[in-house]
Amino acid sequence: VTLTLPPAES
């Protein structure tokens, strides 16, 4: 399955 990652906010 393909996981969708949220935009990384450091």
UniProtKB/Swiss-Prot annotation:
The modification Serine amide is found at S10. Expressed by the venom gland. Its main location: secreted. It is found in: Secreted. The keyword Secreted applies. This is Cryptide Pep-17. It comes from the Eukaryota. It comes from Tityus obscurus. Keywords: Amidation, Secreted. GO terms for cellular component: extracellular region.
